[in-house]
Amino acid sequence: MTTKPERIIIFDTTLRDGEQCPGATLNIDEKLAIAKQLARLGVDIIEAGFAFASPGDFEAVHKIAQTVGTENGPVICSLARARHDDIKAAAEAIKPAAKGRIHTFIATSDIHLQYKLKKTRPEVIAIAEEMVAYAKSFTDDVEFSPEDAGRSDPEFLYQVLERAIAAGATTINIPDTVGYTTPSEFGAIIKGIKENVPNIDQAIISVHGHNDLGLAVANFLEAVKNGARQLECTINGIGERAGNAALEELVMAMHVRRQYFNPFLGRHPDSEEPLTNIDTKQIYKTSRLVSNLTGMLVQPNKAIVGANAFAHESGIHQDGVLKNKLTYEIMDAQLIGLTDNQIVLGKHSGRNAFRTRLKELGFELSETELNKAFVKFKEVADKKKEISDWDLEAIVNDEIQQAPDLFRVELVQVSCGSNARPTATVTLRTPDGEELTDAAIGTGPVDAVYKAINRVVNVPNQLIEFSVQSVTAGIDAIGEVTIRLRYESRVFSGHAANTDIIVASAQAYVNALNRLYASLQTQDKQTEVTA
């Protein structure tokens, strides 16, 4: 990737920067599931993690490199600070990939130099040069980021970039680390780099931005107009603080407004060639997968993938859409993988019909996963007259993409009413196989269930978020529950779906506790090793 592409390179950092969002902790299997889906989506580069950060991160990057980093698959990248041990760990982690990249960085803004690094400008230039060259000794594909470039002195930034490229960097990434710039300012930064870094034609200009002022996507589109050819983004825009630039918004903005962006890439305005390598029909499925596994709900009015993105309440709008969708919709929902073809299954539907419909919806399940999902399908079909595609999606996500199965819900029973004190009895199977039962009184049925579960699990935690969403309409709709709980300074999420919202609430809570419990077990093992 040392030559200027005629299209935009999509660099997905959902598994690295996106996972830094509080509560979005993922285990290795979940990261692998997302990485596989990102490959189907068609991203060019997957930043699989920060290999040096922890043994778990290293293993995740290594496993993704082994499994997803095929010859025809995406480039697998690991982040590394501008330090020898970081870069060495990154190189080792990405080694199994057919195409690997090391992404190293050091801050260049005066505030970071003074307070964080406590280094002078010449020292930072020397470190950048040395560490890029060191990374280059492991792989030809090296990306360099001057952290907080948006607040860096332009002249100093040009010097650092020139030396990094001379040392072997093939991609120069310009991060707006704190989401501080406006579109015109960010565009000017990219333009300045194009005009003032003598060897810039030897590298691809990339951009990375946060959404603190809600301007990340707008900044990136302005950067494209000024010469940026790689965009670093996340699914659903998840990430630290207010999040990152959203992949789905960037891709669809350039797809819908292709005639506007074509000339900036040297194309004829009417060219129909896609500006990215993304299979847009995989966008919605990828969004749902990331939302379910991270526990980060997508707001209903979120552009492109929100529940209301293609909904119309106004009578005038509804009338126009019925006559011609283009009156009030600038894109077809089918472009992102939504479909009006809602084939309905029921309790008499067989395993073959179930398998066939899941394949049509894009789910690729192993035989074991299919069996688990089919058992759940039959349970739901006994309670629900018709099972829609939305229900199938919820069933698969709930059964297949779950937390470690340490504690298991065996029984949930509640008693409540207008003049009764809400009481819950729960039975959990422990990691040792023992069944424990306890009961509790709460302010409501869910509170009572959670108190009873806590009495069994006995791990202190604080529930900080509880939300319920209906998958479909109707009194027999499946309800999806997402919860987040805090243990010390860490946040863990849980997700579950069921036609009984109390059962879904119990399962979601246990899923979050299982993530917490697994994390504590990992900590204990690491403590034993270092002791």
Swiss-Prot record:
A Pfam family this chain is assigned to: LeuA_dimer
Cofactor(s) needed by this chain: Mn(2+)
EC code: 2.3.3.13
Residues noted as binding Mn(2+) in the record, renumbered to the chain: 17, 208, 210, 244
Keyword match Ribosomal protein: no
Family matches, as PROSITE patterns: AIPM_HOMOCIT_SYNTH_1, AIPM_HOMOCIT_SYNTH_2, PYR_CT
GO MF annotation terms: 2-isopropylmalate synthase activity; acetyl-CoA C-acetyltransferase activity; manganese ion binding
TM ranges: none
Region (Regulatory domain): 408-531
Compartments it resides in: Cytoplasm
Keywords: Amino-acid biosynthesis, Branched-chain amino acid biosynthesis, Cytoplasm, Leucine biosynthesis, Manganese, Metal-binding, Transferase
Pathway the protein contributes to: Amino-acid biosynthesis; L-leucine biosynthesis; L-leucine from 3-methyl-2-oxobutanoate: step 1/4
Main localization category: cytoplasm
Subunit details: Homodimer.
NCBIfam families: leuA_bact (TIGR00973), PRK00915.1-3 (NF002086)
Family, as annotated: Belongs to the alpha-IPM synthase/homocitrate synthase family. LeuA type 1 subfamily.
Function: Catalyzes the condensation of the acetyl group of acetyl-CoA with 3-methyl-2-oxobutanoate (2-ketoisovalerate) to form 3-carboxy-3-hydroxy-4-methylpentanoate (2-isopropylmalate).
Protein name per UniProt: 2-isopropylmalate synthase
